Amino acid sequence: MADGQMPFSCHYPSRLRRDPFRDSPLSSRLLDDGFGMDPFPDDLTASWPDWALPRLSSAWPGTLRSGMVPRGPTATARFGVPAEGRTPPPFPGEPWKVCVNVHSFKPEELMVKTKDGYVEVSGKHEEKQQEGGIVSKNFTKKIQLPAEVDPVTVFASLSPEGLLIIEAPQVPPYSTFGESSFNNELPQDSQEVTCT
């Protein structure tokens, strides 16, 4: 075999080209193994905050092999990229919140609007003469609103660091008329008095 036919120049004819991630019979389990142990033993977890421990000690959602990206509801939490292009749903009672870095734009150059279930953030610099040329910057970012958020309640604020913070409270769950989740009668020790 000539050196020109091998992907790497190696002068040992007994060496064969191999990919350890594809050729080995164990390659399918190479990155899947938990080795029968939790990621963190119990004695090391005493100092971890309560919110971090379940996230760090939970099992990996699926296999991750070269060239593969996990898809599913946990992909958002683990990789910061929402599955199916949606923003993550807020936790019950917490407002929906998204931050957009707009540090190179002035407040008067930014526009935030809601349309068809999306928040659209856009910014545009006027043309400026810089370093022997004309520079113009503009961007548009669309963020899909979760179903739990009313588009009318969306508001935005700009931090001193140049982060545009877009927030909206969750819509409270509606109950249908006649549902037994609430009582129509006033309690006997009520402070209300009927006026005559």
Swiss-Prot record:
Source domain of life: Eukaryota
Tissue expression summary: Predominantly expressed in skeletal muscle and heart.
Keywords, sorted A to Z: Chaperone, Charcot-Marie-Tooth disease, Cytoplasm, Disease variant, Methylation, Myofibrillar myopathy, Neurodegeneration, Neuropathy, Nucleus, Phosphoprotein, Stress response
Residue(s) carrying Phosphoserine: S24, S57
GO cellular component: cytoplasm; cytosol; nucleoplasm; nucleus; protein folding chaperone complex
Biased composition regions of type Polar residues, renumbered to the chain: 177-196
UniProt subcellular location: Cytoplasm; Nucleus
Chief site of localization: cytoplasm
PROSITE patterns: SHSP
Modified residues (Phosphothreonine): T63
Single GO MF annotation: protein homodimerization activity
GO biological process: cellular response to unfolded protein; positive regulation of aggrephagy
Sequence ranges assigned to domain sHSP in this UniProt record: 74-185
Disulfide bonding pattern of the chain: none
Induction: By 17-beta-estradiol.
Family named by the database record: Belongs to the small heat shock protein (HSP20) family.
The protein's name: Heat shock protein beta-8
Organism name: Homo sapiens (Human)
Gene that encodes it: HSPB8
